[in-house]
């Protein structure tokens, strides 16, 4: 492995990278839509639901019907609005806890995460899904509860928890913006320089943004993902499995 660049932090996309796009599009999204009417009927005024309802624009949160109509419209357009993503996470909770929902990881994901973690590298997540939804997904996978694989932050000298390993469009910004990756790396600068980060995603525009920020970044090619054109492939590293990552870099960190 001599001569390969070293990576201390691996930043992972979720949909189309660690699990099939179909799990999100064909299972999670329909589940949320199906669960929403009953939730609105039984929990509209409940303290637990109020924060999610209040996050919606007032004109769309005046009645259960107005909120339901707005959610259907947003999801039909596949818009990644933070208040929608937060609500979806809330709706998925019951499905995960009941066993109806379980994230089907690609078979190469868990072995790679375990190896990288055991080598001292830190693993972080960056997804358009809310941080709460990300934690649910990693808790309920086909490989069991894998939250221990994800870096969960440090404590400062005053005991205050510093920025951790889960990032979304609220605490980081939009995924196709260079500044979002700069923010993530800066917030976790204790883990390594930005050039020691590797971002893995199926989205070419996200990969380019991460590279512009100074990170290493590879395009993950999976069955069911959009085809990567010849033009898009130019200048990019493509991997079809996490097992291929270490053909290009050494994922490890100094150990005490």
UniProtKB/Swiss-Prot annotation:
Family: Belongs to the HAD-like hydrolase superfamily. MasA/MtnC family.
GO MF entries: acireductone synthase activity; magnesium ion binding
UniProt cross-references to InterPro entries, sorted A to Z: Enolase-ppase_E1 (IPR023943), ENOPH1_eukaryotes (IPR027511), HAD-like_sf (IPR036412), HAD_sf (IPR023214)
Pathway(s) the chain acts in: Amino-acid biosynthesis; L-methionine biosynthesis via salvage pathway; L-methionine from S-methyl-5-thio-alpha-D-ribose 1-phosphate: step 3/6; Amino-acid biosynthesis; L-methionine biosynthesis via salvage pathway; L-methionine from S-methyl-5-thio-alpha-D-ribose 1-phosphate: step 4/6
Quaternary assembly: Monomer.
Cystines in this chain: none
Annotated protein name in UniProt: Enolase-phosphatase E1
Source organism per UniProt: Botryotinia fuckeliana (strain B05.10)
């Amino acid at each position: 492995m001599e001569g390969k660049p070293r990576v201390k932090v691996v930043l992972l996309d979720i949909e189309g990278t660690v699990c099939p796009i179909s799990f999100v599009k064909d299972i999670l999204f329909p589940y949320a839509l199906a669960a929403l009417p009953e939730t609105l009927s039984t929990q509209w005024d409940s303290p637990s639901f109020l924060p999610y309802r209040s996050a919606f624009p007032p004109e769309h949160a005046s009645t259960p019907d107005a909120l339901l109509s707005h959610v259907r419209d947003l999801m039909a357009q596949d818009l990644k609005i933070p208040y929608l993503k937060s609500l979806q996470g809330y709706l998925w909770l019951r499905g995960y806890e009941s066993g109806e929902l379980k994230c089907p990881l690609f078979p190469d994901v868990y072995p790679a995460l375990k190896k990288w973690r055991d080598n001292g590298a830190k693993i972080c997540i960056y997804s358009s899904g809310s941080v709460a939804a990300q934690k649910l997904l990693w808790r309920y996978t086909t490989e069991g509860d894998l939250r221990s694989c994800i870096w969960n932050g440090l404590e400062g000298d005053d005991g205050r928890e510093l920025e951790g390993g889960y990032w979304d469009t609220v605490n980081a910004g939009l995924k196709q913006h260079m500044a979002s990756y700069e923010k993530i790396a800066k917030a976790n600068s204790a883990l390594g320089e930005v050039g020691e980060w590797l971002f893995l995603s199926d989205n070419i525009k996200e990969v380019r943004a991460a590279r512009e920020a100074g990170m290493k970044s590879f395009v993950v090619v999976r069955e069911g993902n959009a085809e990567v054109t010849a033009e898009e492939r130019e200048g990019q590293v493509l991997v079809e499995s996490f097992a291929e990552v270490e053909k290009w870099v050494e994922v490890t960190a100094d150990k005490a």
